[in-house]
Amino acid sequence: MAVAYIQEFPITNRSTENYDFVAEKIGDGPFDGLIAHTAGFDDEAGVFRILDIWESQEHAQRFLDEHVQPLVDQGPAAFPNPDNFTQPTRDGFYELHHAVSGAGAHAISS
């Protein structure tokens, strides 16, 4: 079942330095089960939001455990902007009823 994974971080400044550091370390994939990845500022909500769509929660959790968590576990000192290293205020999954991806218009419905 397709799921969305969302993280939101309060906007303290408009720096993406730590996000860019993680993205560079992880690379561009391909990652098993990833359908789409987005990241950007939602000024109205006051957050920097990461939103991924995965084929399943298991795919997402495997990716997080293998690629993201080892970097986060190193702590703020490992990041280029340690003063801007914060925990997300929102971090979780939700089941998707329907999703459509890019050029091939690949639809996923529950």
Residues of each region from the PLM?
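Short S/T/G/P-rich N-terminal loop/turn motif that feeds into the first structured element of a domain
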Residues: 1-73, 77-110
